[in-house]
Amino acid sequence: MSMDSVISSRSGADYRSFRQITRDRLLFEMLRSTKKSSKSAWKVLIMDKLTVKIMSFSCKMADVMEEGVSLVEDLYMRRQPLPLMDAIYFIQPTKENIRIFMSDMSGKIPLYKKAYVFFSSPVQRELVAQIKKDSNVRARIGALSEMNLEYFAIDSQGFTTDHDKALEELFSENAEGSLKYNSCLNMMATRIATVFASMREFPRVHYRVARTIDASTLTTLRDLAPTKLAAGVWNCLARFKAMIPEFPQTETCELLIVDRSIDQIAPIIHEWTYDAMCHDLLCMDGNKYVQQVPSKSGSGTENKEVLLEDHDPIWLELRHVHIANASERLHEKMTNFVSKNKAAQLHQARNGGDLSTKELQKMVQALPQYSDQIDKLALHVEIAGKLNSTIKEQQLKDVGQLEQDLVFGDAGTKELINFFRTHLDISRENKLRLLMVYAAINPDKTRSDKGAKLMQLAGLSADDMIAVSNMRCLCGHDSKKSSAGGFTLKFDLRKKRHGIRKERIGEESKWMLSRFYPILEELIEKLSKGELPKDEYHYLNDPSPSFRGIPSASTQTSPAHQPAQSMRSRRTGGTWARPRDSDDGYSSDSVLKHTSSNSRKLGQRLFVFVIGGATRSELCAAHKLSSKLKREIILGSSSLDDPPQFITKLKMLSTDDLTLDDLQI
């Protein structure tokens, strides 16, 4: 059962999830609302470069056409005049966009009969006055409204603000005094606020404070990013509170703002869930995967683009499970399909043995009535096969084992050196990621001669070491002055080896290499229980007496909410291909799947925003914890980065001459 179906129990049948609300606003509040006064049966929808992405992340073209849109146009392209049709403009409220709009609708013969204008974020008064000043344009406007929806709904529980360069603009060596710093944060704040405008939610705003060690330590702009962003979001919310009808006047949810410095490991380490591995190891463009299918002519193969999205039930089931678990489930699905289908059995008997991906694809032609079912099964069998081959070819089990041993303190410098000496055929990219994990745990060791020797031993270039060196930009201050503990990546001086994760009681590894968890998961649980460290996390607004953000006592006392305790590794107990009975919450067989529509109502929503890019492991944690905590958890970020993207961005933090294209790894 999906989160969307489970959360409908929160407040009855009218409850809608984050993505559903976003979609409904675009289709019904914007497109459908124009039908009341428009005499045009079909309309033109005009969008700019940003709003077309906003729309595409939430709606299909068929959805848009169903609301009376026959043509979608680019605001910046030369367009054919359609003076007998009405137009819907969904655009950002910029001077250039408004200039183009007014040019379209002014003069004796405008491009369109009537215009319905919807701005994605608040529009400046002077720009509205400019529109109203032109009597010809004013007479042709059917609606002029602020949609306040300026974010990408990338997932049923995730969004980004489309700030792909946030890491560079906010954390680079040149961020201090840069005009881009304030511009980036201001726009980010506005877009985050539009999430709450869409959801009609008013949050209690928590944020990570600057990590000042003592009065002599200079607080940098990097350290102040969460504080400044929290203030910016609050200012926007204050405006919405006064201007938007039915906007809550008291707190209805919680928002936590952090930055990428809380966890430098999560964007680098190899994740073993199906979704994370697809985006890490396969050459995908966003969610697009290129599948090889039999050509229509019958000879050879051809490429077919497919989207790994929510409409695919197999993807929904597998995306957050371990790759070994996913492979087992796919094998079971194939076996079940064949056992229940006589035609498939005959096809298998003719070919002999198990069905391969190609044989499944041929079966689509032989059994057209099952084409959709077999198509999706063949797709994921092919993907899982590629992933397992890559894992074997790149020796990723060995790489992943050392990564996690370093993180949990079961390995150190000696083991890393030995690995580099004995695994000479490991790829440069994987050696770099190993060294970056080591650097996050032992920052001082990689800045000394030892770091240069490790680089030489691993066969890394000076260009690779830029990424390792630039991790210091996310540390805030000199790690030598850091105190141990907390959520920051400071090594613990009390340990012989510097493990920066604790094993958690009650969450024993179900699969080999599944011990790792992002720090954000721990933070969300602490926030839900009201246990965020007060010296590290402040809030802007005191909660009103009616605020019910903290879950009920019954939730707090459940075994799943016991505090984490340090313990030795149980890594030898994990298994690559055989599950244990423990439930880690990631599986579709978790509590989420078995929650009935009559279950206890969910608590208030919890939003988390990560400045500088979120990871797929963090998005996975949002889904997992929504089930565990009985609250819809929505993860937002400036971008969603896979390891190669993050490493490329890290390299940009200390250079002026290189571009992203120059530094792709």
Curated annotation (Swiss-Prot):
Comp. bias intervals (Polar residues): 552-567, 585-594
Pfam families: Sec1
InterPro entries: Sec-1-like_dom1, Sec-1-like_dom3a, Sec1-like, Sec1-like_dom2, Sec1-like_sf
GO cellular component: plasma membrane; secretory granule
Gene Ontology molecular function: syntaxin binding
Sorted UniProt keywords: Protein transport, Transport
Chain residue ranges for the region called Disordered: 543-594
GO biological process: intracellular protein transport; vesicle docking involved in exocytosis; vesicle-mediated transport
Ion transport is among the record's keywords: no
Family under the similarity heading: Belongs to the STXBP/unc-18/SEC1 family.
Summary of the function given for this chain in its UniProt record: Involved in the vesicle trafficking. Binds syntaxins.
Record protein name field: Probable protein transport Sec1a
